[in-house]
Structures are given as C-alpha cells and as structure tokens.
Amino acid sequence: YAFLLHDRESGQSALVDSPDAKAIRAELDQRGWGLNYILLTHHHWDHVDGVDALRQHYDAKVIGAKADAHRLPGLDRAVSDGETFDLFGAPVHVMDVSGHTLGHIAFYLPDSQAVFTADSLMALGCGRLFEGTPAQMWQSLSRLAALPADTLVYSGHEYTQSNAAFALTIEPDNAALQARVAEVNTKAKRREATVPSYLREEIETYPFLRASNPKVKA
C-alpha cells in the first residue's frame, strides 16, 4: 500500500511510501492534486520504487530515516527516532520500528489519530525479519502498542487473511479474533481492503501483541 494525505486548506499533498509511480500519478491526476512530500518508511523496493519517477513530475521533498539514508532514493530530509516535524501545520512523530529492516520508521500523526507502520505492525501480523532481531521487533511492536487504542494503523500490505488464519492457530477460543476473522474473510470475498485497522483491534486479536496472556503463552 501507499497512502495519500491531502490538506484542503493549503492544497498540499503528501505520499507515504511509493511503490508504483504510474498508479500514484493517476490517482493524483484524477483528484487534481500535486505532490509536495514523500515520506518513506524503509528502503525495500516495493516502498521506494516510484520515487525517482514521481520526482520527475513533482517538486516533492523526500523524508526518511537518517539510519537508512544510504539506501533511500532522493532523500532531502533525514529524520531520527523521537524527532517531530511539521506536515500541513500538524506534528508528525518519528518512531524507530526496526525489525523487518534496520532503519525502518513509522510516522505517527496524533492530530489525525493515525500511524503509518508499513511492514512493522500489520493487520494481524508483522513483517518478516530480514535485518533486525526478534528483540528489536518485539520492542517495536511494544512501542506501537503503547499508542492510544483508537489510533488507526495504516500498514503496508494486504496479508490480513493469511495472518488471521495463523492467529487462529494460536488463540482459537478468542471470541474477538473469531469475529474479526469472519469480517476479514467477508471483505476478502468482496475484494475490499482490511487496512487501516484500529490499534485496539490488533491488541485484542494479534497474538504477538498478546504475549502476556496466559493462553497465548501456553
């Protein structure tokens, strides 16, 4: 997934991750928007592949992790964990969520009650460990879980149905999980997105965020 953010007052737009320049340009053109910022979560090609092509058409500033600067295309501003920057007059908090990769960051927008997690925390899952350690991923998931429960989680991939099937093998008697799996399967049949999800849902149904529960430990 890539996500477009638009500020009606200023007319400015931002993009979180850039997998497919052609599709993103088509959406921007359809809406009559320009592109002012590109926020990158990590260096994997399916999150940065469209950056160079988009920059040929838009004067967009690229923002990404300082720790990943050597692997991010066209980086204009390098940000670090704990840093806050302004986007459309609202704060964006940078969170280190290493694990899937080293240097992976999430963007938390408290005023919008949204966090863009890409391949760290997903709907009922998390990204595979390519570079980080299990301890790093656990720390990252724990940090994200500490955000307000009504935060919307915008993750990077539509893996929810397979993640749900795995979660059921861990907690088959979790009523909240059973209900969510049914909803996910219904959406899959309709070819509807399951992203974003509420952080509350992840805490109630995702086993890795429920590791302190005796049933999950068993």
Give residue ranges: language-model regions:
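Divalent metal-coordination and catalytic microenvironments
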Residues: 5, 17, 42, 54, ...
